[in-house]
Amino acid sequence: MAKRELQDKGSTEHRAKKKSRNEKHTKKAEDSQASAQSSETQYTDPKEPSPAVIEKFLEENSVKITDTLEGATKLHPITSFSHLPTCNSALYRPLESFTSPTAIQSATWPFLFSGRDVIGIAETGSGKTLGFGLPCLKNLQDSAKKGKPYKPTAVMISPTRELAMQIHDQISKFAELVDIKVACIFGGVKKEEQREALKTAAIVVATPGRLKDLQNDGSVDLGKVKYLVLDEADRMLDKGFEQDIKDIIRPMPVSKRQTVMFTATWPPVVRDLAATFMTSPVTVTIGGEPSADPRANTRIKQVVEVVKPHEKEQRLVQLLNKYQKGPSSSDKILVFCLYKKEAVRVERLLWNKGFKVAGIHGDLGQQERFKSLESFKKGVSTVLVATDVAARGLDIPSVKLVINVTFPLTVEDYVHRIGRTGRAGAEGHAITLFTEVDKAQSGALINVLKAANQDVPEDLLKFGATVKKKQHDAYGAFYKDVDTNKTSTKIVFDD
């Protein structure tokens, strides 16, 4: 009897908690809708495009917009900078050097300027930094008119320090015009300077690990953050930052926070994160249906050459001589190696062959990495040899060609590598030297090539089209899923 009463009591408490959670979620959705509707009254499209123009834009850019909020006002893509909401004209001044918004900017801006939570699923190099950055700055400007804004008011989290620095640099160009301070927080450097920057920063761009450290020691209070961006969410979760992200978000307000997530893929773990921290988000997909599998930019011409391991470096020199001659002698070429020692050896080889080469890999300090990147960006060096530390998020303008000397450990990293070319609407070119050593990745690579309508060489097909099971982070190739519902086998020993 006592056991029955205890079960009834537990069941009652469970129902009460569930009801409380549902009521809380409903109220949050209502608050979000009210906020969005309030913002929508401020945002008006001065030249609303015709249905035919909208349909053409969506079709040409493979844009799909899914809004889960019932009764929400239907907003149209912002296809011209002249359609942006009114604000301090100085904020929009840098836009004069651009002709028109990118597809991801056009599709997400109406919702972001209206205060809605947004999930953007798009390739790297699609202009998403400005996509989430401009609405954030406009939001901060509006807050400043009502009084002194709390610091920090906006937090933007990225998976690597290189990407954090890139986001910081791009947003700072706009922020400094309207007197908004931006701090860049990442590991590998002393914390004291970062603590000082946090005292005046309205926007914090950070990697998860260092931000959590500063949060834990009381250097930063995130209790009044109103604008949160998770950039390259899939990559952050791949790197094991899920718990750090949850700890960072926990003290932030719920109903008054606008949350933005950008991701290149849409696996279950990213969906779960979105379901946990976002309210009735609008999902904007560029380039077809969202997929859990990595997809390459279709504007990149992918070429796979099957070679013998000892032929790779000789073939690399041949390719560089071919693609850096005559009028193309100053074209930027990014060369990827798998290991640091390999990168150092290849860099030395190319230097001895007379190429203007720089290197970036894990053994270099922050200043050395920065120096190499700047040299490559400015054209002082026309070849950059890198390991995967530079594969994700770096925005290096006008990379004409990516060469993979050694195939990466995963096809996801392959997609990230070649994504350094063909950015911001430009055409790109990637050449991969594939050997028998890499044959475990042949099936996954073939799928990426086919999905992007690229040629699959016969030599690659010989390795097989089977996709190998992804290894577990902790248990490697010996990991297997265990069916916990399966009846155990009883083992009986004879006497």
UniProtKB/Swiss-Prot annotation:
UniProt xrefs under SMART domains: DEXDc, HELICc
Domain Helicase ATP-binding: start-end pairs: 109-284
Placement of sequence motif DEAD box: 231-234
Keywords of this entry: ATP-binding, Helicase, Hydrolase, Nucleotide-binding, Nucleus, Ribosome biogenesis, RNA-binding, rRNA processing
Predominant subcellular localization, coarse grouping: nucleus
EC number, UniProt record: 3.6.4.13
GO biological process: endonucleolytic cleavage in ITS1 upstream of 5.8S rRNA from tricistronic rRNA transcript (SSU-rRNA, 5.8S rRNA, LSU-rRNA)
Compositional bias of kind Basic residues: 15-27
Enzyme class: hydrolase
Positions with biased composition (Basic and acidic residues): 1-14
Chain span(s) of sequence motif Q motif: 97-105
All residue ranges annotated as the Helicase C-terminal domain in the record: 315-464
One GO CC term, this protein: preribosome, large subunit precursor
Entry annotated with the keyword RNA-binding: yes
Subcellular location: Nucleus, Nucleolus
Molecular functions (GO terms): ATP binding; ATP hydrolysis activity; RNA binding; RNA helicase activity
InterPro entries named among the record's database cross-references: DEAD/DEAH_box_helicase_dom, Helicase_ATP-bd, Helicase_C-like, P-loop_NTPase, RNA-helicase_DEAD-box_CS
KW Metal-binding (keyword) present: no
Residues given in the record as ATP binding sites: A122, E123, T124, G125, S126, G127, K128, T129
Region of interest (Disordered), residue spans: 1-49
Reaction catalyzed: ATP + H2O = ADP + phosphate + H(+)
Family to which this protein belongs: Belongs to the DEAD box helicase family. DDX5/DBP2 subfamily.
Domain remark from Swiss-Prot or TrEMBL: The Q motif is unique to and characteristic of the DEAD box family of RNA helicases and controls ATP binding and hydrolysis.
Function noted in UniProt: ATP-dependent RNA helicase required for 60S ribosomal subunit synthesis. Involved in efficient pre-rRNA processing, predominantly at site A3, which is necessary for the normal formation of 25S and 5.8S rRNAs.
Protein name: ATP-dependent RNA helicase dbp3
